[in-house]
Amino acid sequence: MKNLLSHINSTEDLRRLSVEDLPQLANELRRFIIEVIASKEGHLGASLGVVELTIALHYVYNTPKDLLVWDVGHQAYGHKILTGRKSEFHTNRQFKGISGFPKRDESEYDTFGTGHSSTSISAALGMAIASQLKGEDRLHVAVIGDASIASGMAFEGLNHAGVTTANLLVILNDNAIGIDPSVGALKQYLTNVKKGTQKQDNIFEALNFEYFGPVDGHDLKALSSELKRLKSIDGPKFLHVITTKGKGLRQAEKDQVKYHAPGKFDAKTGDILSKNNDDIPPKYQDVFGHTLLDLANSN
């Protein structure tokens, strides 16, 4: 069987594939991420969970003309690999390497610099309104997780978008977990939506979005078909996608908190490797924390 990923260096290459080829590509992309992150470290679980969604988005939408905004950026590894950075991916988060998050000066596909959560809806909405004002024929997509969407800034973006005619699609990547399991009333509501037991009116329709879903986020054929259909619908739209964080690596699916960013691990077994801390420089946050404690002790 011919390896597909090795022949993809741009989204144009991706869009030359048939829909029937996409599941094979998803398996290869997931394996590639696992093999690189096993030795180089990084945010594993989130990127494994959106492999199919990433492929479907770049397959259906005319990126980079159509603008795609990832919230936080933990899940952007597949996006980077498919948009011309496969050969550099081993330098991810390394000195003089590529960024671990979307970065505007790194690629035209990285439409917005991320790192902090809950900014994607406002950013994509601003781009959509700007395109409207300039008369540009562009589509705009924000991908946000179920933990990030519970933040105030996300609700501000939804609230604003709901009174516009902006051509905006918000995709909820619902895996019921951020770095830790999601909590709160919105999480309970989304759980009930997935079960079909919600008693309340649809919260997103109440904000003037057309709501679609839930959709299986690992069914490439269904995802691609739904995204293609939504391209023809004007105005604010909301697609609810159900995914599994850590998909494709048994341990990462089982312990989603630990495998959010597990450090080095065995790519075949998934077992986390013990660290030799003697050769590892301290992390910035640890230096900062210890410095604060030293200052507090002296004053």
Predicted features along the sequence, with ranges:
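Generic structural signal of hydrophobic/aromatic residues within well-ordered alpha-helices
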Residues: M1-L4, I33, Y77-I81, R85-N92, ...
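N-terminal amphipathic, basic-rich helices that act as targeting or association modules
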Residues: M1-T83, E205-F209, P214-S224, L230, ...
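Residue-level signal for pocket-adjacent positions within structured domains
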Residues: N3, N9-E12, S39, G84-S87, ...
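Short amphipathic alpha-helical segments, especially helix-boundary/capping motifs
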Residues: N9, N27-I33, S99-R104, L133-G135, ...
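Arginine residue identity/basic-tract feature
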Residues: R15-R16, R30-R31, R85, R93, ...
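Cofactor-binding active-site loop characterized by glycine-rich and histidine/acidic residues
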Residues: L25, G42-T164, Y284, F288-N299
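Glycine-rich ThDP/TPP pyrophosphate-binding loop and its adjacent helix/strand module
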Residues: D110-F265, D271-P281, Q285-H290, S298
